[in-house]
UniProtKB/Swiss-Prot annotation:
Domain of life according to the entry: Bacteria
UniProt record similarity statement: Belongs to the methylthiotransferase family. MiaB subfamily.
Keyword Metal-binding set for record: yes
Keywords: 4Fe-4S, Cytoplasm, Iron, Iron-sulfur, Metal-binding, S-adenosyl-L-methionine, Transferase, tRNA processing
UniProt-recorded name of the protein: tRNA-2-methylthio-N(6)-dimethylallyladenosine synthase
Quaternary structure note: Monomer.
Main location: cytoplasm
The gene coding this protein: miaB
Job of this protein: Catalyzes the methylthiolation of N6-(dimethylallyl)adenosine (i(6)A), leading to the formation of 2-methylthio-N6-(dimethylallyl)adenosine (ms(2)i(6)A) at position 37 in tRNAs that read codons beginning with uridine.
């Protein structure tokens, strides 16, 4: 009888990536097949996020539902992973004694052993350590699930912004070696992936070891990824302004595979608030980066993160944020009301902004961003945009859907053989959350592919030394 696994995931794209790796790993080691129905599962895993308010209570609410399933099936294994698990550790079992496994983002690769241990003597397992980059060495080979794929290139963050729990829950920055990353991407390209999204909590801080022992920069890595045949688009998230160096901007100037869209969090337009947040940059320095980026890539569109109602934020501080939004002309944002995260310096600050004022500021900010986003979309009306076709439209199975370089969803009429390929689409209609278009050119008319296949890239780039150890050969 097939054993089944159910994973519930909250939070960032890194968590989504981690959950996919858990599924692949437990399929490879135990033959677990994913199910969307928790009641069918032999193992339930909750991959948590601690960024937002009441994250812990959300976890225990979900666990309460799963407790009922365990009462019906005592052999059911329940595991809690992610950032709340890393933050709370053994405290989770104090409130939910029926949880069998507690693991952190850096120990998910040990899940097979943890499950075996629980199956053996029913003793609970708690492992929330930070074993450097070990987890990537233990994960199975990547498996493509469409024309786009996420690839984690580094973990953790050293910035210690006063409001953020990431350094405490995912550890400090650790970068994967460049040859490991490139080999994974080449494998994905061989399976039909056309676009990769490089992931990291502070992705542009990547400083990975090269095959010859030297240390590569993020700009170096972007150029190497762009050289892999079959990879026609590169995205990355999330970056930090303090690490956004001129050599990265030069890649935007020289490398068409890097898309004309960037998510670069700023959080506030007030230098005083930025200082309280521990951001280590000013609003002017942020705008200087954007100015240089647009000089290198005039059509680039920028999204960002904002926190409103940070302790001590005055009306004047908020107005400076609104001015920055207008000056940069952001295309979209992830914006939130400040909520203190336990264990962070900001949790000890006086939360002196009234709740109603926070809500009003958030509404004003989001309305302005929405207006700017619609203005950007209207400029695209009548233009021809290159779309990577990801599948059928959510609105109609009779239509296809894909994304532009600047991350706009476009729905259009097409044929199934277009899925996984590029098409050029003329934009005919603009809506708040999507665009509509008609196909004017198929990939066969573009000449994108080169004669060399992704398989030959793997063969060319993966060499072995005298001991049989693989390394990357550019």
């Amino acid at each position: 009888m097939t054993k089944k696994l159910h994973i519930k995931t909250w939070g960032c794209q890194m968590n989504e990536y981690d959950s996919s790796k858990m599924a692949d790993l437990l399929d490879a080691t135990h033959g677990y097949q994913l199910t969307d129905v928790a009641e069918e599962a032999d193992v339930l895993l909750l991959n948590t996020c601690s960024i937002r308010e009441k994250a812990q209570e959300k976890v225990f609410h979900q666990l309460g539902r799963w407790k009922l399933l365990k009462e019906k099936n005592p052999d059911l294994i329940i595991g809690v992973g992610g950032c709340v698990a890393s933050q709370e550790g053994e405290h989770i079992r104090q409130r939910a004694h029926y949880v069998d496994i507690i693991f952190g983002p850096q120990t998910l690769h040990r899940l097979p052993e943890m499950i075996n241990s629980v199956r053996g003597d029913r003793s609970p397992v708690v492992d929330i350590s930070f074993p450097e980059i070990e987890k990537f060495d233990r994960l199975p080979e990547p498996r493509a699930e469409g024309p786009t794929a996420f690839v984690s290139i580094m973990e953790g963050c050293n910035k210690y912004c006063t409001y953020c729990v990431v350094p405490y829950t995912r550890g400090e920055e650790v970068s994967r070696p460049s040859d490991d990353i490139l080999f994974e991407i080449a494998q994905l390209a061989a399976q039909g992936v056309r676009e990769v999204n490089l992931l990291g909590q502070n992705v542009n801080a990547w400083r990975g070891e090269n095959y010859d022992g030297t240390t590569g920069t993020f700009a170096d890595l972007l150029r190497l990824v762009a050289a892999i045949d079959g990879i026609d688009r590169i995205r990355f998230t999330t970056s930090h302004p303090i690490e956004f160096t001129d050599d990265i901007i030069e890649v935007y100037r020289d490398t068409p595979e890097l898309v004309s869209f960037l998510h670069l969090p700023v959080q506030s337009g007030s230098d005083r608030i930025l200082n309280l947040m521990g951001r280590t940059h000013t609003a002017l320095e942020y705008k200087a980066i954007i100015r240089k980026l647009r000089a290198a890539r005039p059509d680039i569109q920028i999204s960002s993160d904002f926190i409103v109602g940070f302790p001590g934020e005055t009306t004047e501080d908020f107005e400076k944020t609104m001015k920055l939004i207008a000056d940069v002309n952001f295309d979209m944002s992830y914006s939130f009301i400040f909520s203190a995260r336990p264990g962070t310096p900001a949790a000890d600050m006086v939360d002196d902004v009234p709740e109603e004022e926070k809500k009003q500021r958030l509404y004003i900010l989001q309305e302005r961003i929405n207006q700017q986003a619609m203005a950007w979309s209207r400029r695209m009306l009548g233009t021809t945009q290159r779309i990577l076709v990801e599948g059928t439209s959510r609105k109609s199975i009779m239509e296809l859907s894909g994304r532009t370089e600047n991350n706009r969803v476009v729905n259009f009429e097409g044929t199934p053989d277009m899925i996984g390929k590029f098409v050029d689409v003329e934009i005919t209609d603009v809506y708040p959350n999507s665009l509509r278009g008609k196909v004017v050119r198929t990939e066969d008319e573009m000449g994108l592919r080169v004669a060399e296949t992704p398989e030959s890239v793997i063969a060319r780039t993966r060499k072995e030394n005298d001991l049989g150890v693989g390394y990357y050969q550019p």
